[in-house]
């Protein structure tokens, strides 16, 4: 009658794809989306099987978004699968009901708490600065960018339920925002790296790429990252947009350090010789199309080298 997904983003994404293939024909790669045109093509023709999602991590927001990420081992690539409703009552990839209870995250170990919590922050960050990000999401993305730095250290260090509740609320809110705004080079590079090195937790790859991508993008869009600084509670009075944007990068790096997340690809065990491939394959992802600053393979290689 219904699929019930209890777990983190990988569990929920797997369940989403199971509900898709229950009611639609073809192998899963036929539903991969790599460009905005792939999304609007409407490859999901039939309503998916009913799905209830129950997240046990505060990170991906997959319980309420229209997307799934599935690794194709033969390609060493993380496929994006997804579709919003393209017309009233149209088919989409996602849950019918989501049950969100912070007590279900109580046993999440510190390392996973840090990685998934930072992933939630990165969703709000990239949704906020994305090319074409609608204004309607920005009150929510601002709130999450303030909420996660406030509560993630406590959740990581003590596991306090109040902190976990706030993180789950932030993750859930950011998940909604994902349905209206895109991501960017952080997720492109991190997902490609995770496809090539499946042992690397997604949130840790996200943490490594976030400051370098911020530095790259703020060169052309400092005002957007100045807003990130304000959202994180930084006093930007008297600062130029560029100065405020660099303060935001510093605050993000401080958060990463505070919860002991990795700070380099070398620390994650990535071979430096793989950086050109990571840059090239990132151009095949759906997320790169919403990066605020244009990026080709050479630019992404520079970002990856900065992350190394």
Where are the regions that the model predicts?
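Glycine-rich phosphate/pyrophosphate-binding beta-alpha loops
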Residues: 59, 172-203, 285-289
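C-terminal and late-domain segments of enzyme folds
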Residues: 109-173
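Gly/Pro-rich interdomain helix-loop hinge
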Residues: 196-199, 203-274
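A glycine/threonine-rich phosphate-anchoring loop and its flanking beta-alpha core
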Residues: 23-133, 226-227
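Short, amphipathic C-terminal "tail helix"
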Residues: 271-308
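N-terminal small/polar loop signature for handling phosphorylated ligands or for N-terminal nucleophile
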Residues: 1-29, 153-164
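Short glycine/serine/threonine-rich phosphate/pyrophosphate-binding segments
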Residues: 10-16, 60-64, 186
């Amino acid at each position: 009658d219904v699929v019930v997904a209890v777990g983190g983003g990988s569990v929920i994404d797997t369940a989403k794809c199971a509900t898709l293939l229950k009611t639609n024909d073809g192998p899963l790669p036929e539903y991969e989306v790599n460009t905005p045109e792939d999304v609007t093509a409407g490859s999901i023709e039939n309503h998916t099987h009913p799905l209830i999602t129950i997240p046990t991590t505060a990170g991906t927001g997959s319980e309420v978004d229209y997307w799934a990420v599935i690794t194709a081992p033969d390609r060493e690539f993380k496929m994006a699968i997804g579709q919003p409703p393209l017309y009233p009552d149209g088919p989409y990839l996602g849950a019918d009901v989501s049950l969100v209870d912070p007590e279900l995250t109580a046993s999440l170990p510190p390392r996973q708490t840090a990685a998934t919590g930072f992933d939630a922050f990165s969703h709000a960050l990239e949704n906020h600065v994305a090319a074409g990000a609608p204004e309607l999401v920005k009150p929510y993305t601002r709130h999450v960018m303030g909420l996660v730095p406030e509560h993630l250290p406590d959740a990581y260090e003590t596991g306090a339920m109040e902190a976990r509740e706030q993180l789950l609320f932030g993750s859930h809110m950011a998940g909604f925002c994902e349905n209206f705004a895109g991501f960017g080079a952080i997720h492109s590079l991190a997902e490609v790296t995770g496809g090539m090195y499946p042992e690397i937790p997604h949130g840790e790859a996200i943490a490594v790429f976030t400051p370098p991508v911020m530095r790259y993008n703020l060169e052309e869009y400092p005002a957007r990252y100045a807003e990130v600084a304000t959202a994180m509670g930084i006093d930007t009075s008297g600062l130029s947009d560029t100065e405020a944007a660099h303060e935001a990068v510093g605050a993000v790096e401080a958060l990463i350090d505070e919860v002991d997340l990795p700070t380099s690809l070398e620390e994650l065990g990535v071979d430096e010789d793989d950086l050109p491939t990571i840059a090239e394959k990132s151009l095949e992802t759906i997320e790169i199309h919403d990066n605020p600053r244009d990026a080709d393979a050479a630019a992404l290689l520079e970002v990856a080298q900065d992350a190394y």
